[in-house]
């Protein structure tokens, strides 16, 4: 009886997520009913939160399609020809871009080169690293060239702190390296888990759209060459850039 009670208590305090598509289930499943992938469910603990305080709902207006005035889309060039090409001519304000690829293929170096070019155009860029120290970033930057004072660095993984820094500094472009190292205090699971990746991406999407800041997210890949984490990560972003190289090259 005690064993059954403990098992029931565990079920109430944990949930299973599909790492491929983010499908949620109260129990473990061998095959996901949503994406049909096998052995992709992982268990995560959940924490009950206090009921949300009811707020007054304000009236909002609706509009017709013909009444919408289109603004000319302004793009910011990265001055990297091929990157600008795959981005449709440059960076769009308020866009969320996922950059994936094998370890060591050059994701961080390319984005640092992008930061250099943007900062030389007097664009305020915030590079947030959860994997390297400031000294390591500077050593890598010195191999690229001279940077302007428009590039700002931050070593932090707490998303709540990062959100506060972004609101204070108001950068035009943000680099998150990487999404798997970020965590929110609102979620009790470990960094890199399905819940944390989904929460972090959702927060960054709100920042990008609400403040019209372009956000680049670096994502790790699995041994199979797929972006690590739930498929919902790829669905939430505006653009997915994937770097491939010859793994057998010397």
Question: How would you label these PLM feature ranges?
Answer:
Residues 4, 13, 24-97, 109, ...:
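Detector for small/aliphatic-rich hydrophobic stretches
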Residues 8-20:
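Short, charged low-complexity linear segments at domain edges
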Residues 22-31, 36-38, 43-44, 175, ...:
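N-terminal, positively charged regions that mediate nucleic acid binding
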Residues 83-86, 99, 137, 177, ...:
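Conserved RecA-like P-loop NTPase ATPase core
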Residues 94, 102-105, 113-114, 118-203:
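Conserved inter-motif catalytic segment of the P-loop NTP-binding fold
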Residues 205-250:
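Phosphate-binding/switch region of NTP-binding enzymes
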């Amino acid at each position: 009886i005690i064993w059954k009670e403990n098992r029931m208590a565990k079920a109430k305090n944990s949930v299973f997520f599909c790492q491929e598509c983010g499908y949620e289930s109260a129990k473990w499943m061998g095959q996901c009913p949503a994406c049909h992938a096998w052995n992709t469910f992982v268990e995560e603990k959940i924490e009950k939160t206090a009921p949300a305080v009811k707020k007054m709902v304000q009236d909002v207006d609706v509009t017709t399609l013909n009444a919408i005035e289109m603004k000319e889309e302004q793009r910011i060039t990265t001055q990297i020809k091929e990157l600008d090409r795959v981005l449709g001519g440059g960076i769009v304000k308020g866009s969320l871009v996922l950059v994936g690829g094998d370890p060591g293929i050059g994701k961080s170096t390319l984005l640092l080169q992008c930061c250099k070019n943007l900062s030389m155009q007097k664009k305020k860029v915030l590079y947030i690293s959860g994997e390297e120290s400031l000294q390591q970033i500077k050593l890598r930057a010195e191999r690229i060239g001279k940077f302007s004072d428009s590039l700002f660095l931050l070593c932090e993984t707490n998303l709540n702190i990062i959100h506060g820094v972004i609101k204070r500094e108001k950068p035009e472009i943000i680099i998150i390296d990487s999404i798997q190292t970020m965590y929110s205090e609102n979620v009790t699971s470990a960094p890199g888990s399905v819940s944390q990746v989904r929460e972090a991406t959702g927060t960054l999407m709100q920042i990008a759209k609400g403040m019209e800041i372009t956000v680049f997210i670096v994502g790790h890949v699995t041994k199979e060459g797929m972006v690590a984490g739930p498929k919902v990560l790829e669905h939430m972003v505006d653009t997915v850039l994937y770097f491939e190289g010859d793994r057998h090259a010397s």
